[in-house]
């Protein structure tokens, strides 16, 4: 069985890889060691943070609407900020707390479907995620010592840790307070089959009947469950996914006409109209704003 065999009845289908193939995340280690006193991390558009509190305790403050929410951390904890959120650490002034930290740059920024589904912050005791400790041990070993390739390897290990966290989120959407969206849809075994089919073949025409058949549900039951989980209709979701993949291909340097054909649009003008309706600009204008050409 292949990793993306969406027709299989096995519950162990890989729900993340097709998404991460199109929307990669790049982690960059920027701190390993003690943090003392009051530390501020300003919101940076399109950028998230992943912090691992290894030892010590501290107060976490983060922007929650118009106010600063406050949480006391007293055990080894992982902190995931998937989007630009101002946050602060208040540590003991001398001994501090021991941290390993990375920035996260998600392809697509705020339109990344993973980012769109997650809350502003996820706070997890390290022991909550089965199998995480092995990756953390490797991460700490590389971040604690300056050896050839250590920084590059630490960056990749942070990405491994993030994927393990995303796995946990899919399996525990209520605990993670996941909003309606792709991640909550993937947490439902039946809906996941339809979503994976859409993710694996964005060029196909995904009708309600076809998606419901993949999920093994009636059209009415599927449409209702899909709307509740993702906050979108099946038709709107499949088009949005197609256009998200289009931006990924455009960023990779594919010509507009080629993107249109690869994703099943009748022609480049049809693709451009759909792109403009969703993004407010044409693909060429979007590329121009990024300093690129079509």
Q: Which residues does each PLM region occupy?
A:
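An amphipathic alpha-helical interaction segment
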Residues: 127-196
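N-terminal intrinsically disordered/low-complexity leader segments
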Residues: 1-12, 174-182, 291-294
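A short, N-terminal "cap"/entry segment at the start of jelly-roll beta-barrel domains
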Residues: 1-29, 37-42, 120-123, 127, ...
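Aromatic/histidine-rich interaction motifs
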Residues: 111-137
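N-terminal regulatory/effector-sensing and dimerization cores
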Residues: 27-121
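Basic/polar phosphate-binding segments, predominantly the helix-turn-helix DNA-binding elements
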Residues: 164, 170, 183, 193-241, ...
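Short helix-to-turn junction characteristic of helix-turn-helix DNA-binding domains
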Residues: 53, 198-201, 246-253
């Amino acid at each position: 069985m292949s990793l993306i065999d969406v027709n299989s009845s096995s519950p162990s289908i890989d729900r993340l890889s097709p998404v991460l193939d199109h929307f990669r995340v790049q982690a960059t280690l920027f701190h390993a060691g003690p943090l003392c006193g009051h530390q501020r991390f300003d919101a940076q558009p399109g950028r998230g943070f992943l912090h691992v509190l290894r030892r010590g305790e501290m107060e976490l403050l983060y922007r929650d609407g118009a106010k600063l929410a406050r949480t006391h951390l007293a055990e080894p904890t992982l902190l995931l900020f998937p989007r630009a959120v101002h946050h602060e650490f208040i540590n003991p002034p001398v001994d501090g707390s021991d941290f390993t930290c990375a920035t996260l740059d998600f392809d697509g920024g705020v339109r990344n479907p993973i980012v769109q589904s997650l809350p502003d912050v996820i706070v997890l005791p390290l022991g909550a995620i089965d199998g995480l400790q092995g990756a953390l041990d490797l991460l700490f070993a590389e971040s604690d010592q300056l050896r050839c390739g250590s920084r590059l390897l630490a960056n990749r290990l942070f990405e491994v840790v993030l994927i393990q966290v995303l796995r946990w989120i899919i399996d525990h959407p209520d605990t993670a307070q996941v909003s309606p969206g792709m991640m909550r849809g993937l947490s439902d075994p039946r809906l996941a089959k339809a979503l994976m089919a859409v993710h694996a073949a964005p060029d196909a025409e995904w009708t309600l009947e076809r998606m419901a058949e993949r999920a093994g549900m009636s059209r009415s039951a599927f449409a209702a469950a899909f709307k509740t989980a993702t906050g979108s209709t099946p038709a709107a979701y499949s088009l949005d996914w197609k256009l998200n993949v289009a931006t990924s291909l455009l960023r990779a340097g594919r010509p507009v006409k080629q993107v249109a054909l690869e994703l099943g649009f009748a022609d480049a003008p049809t693709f451009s109209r759909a792109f403009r309706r969703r993004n407010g600009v044409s693909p060429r204008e979007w590329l121009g704003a990024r300093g690129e050409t079509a």
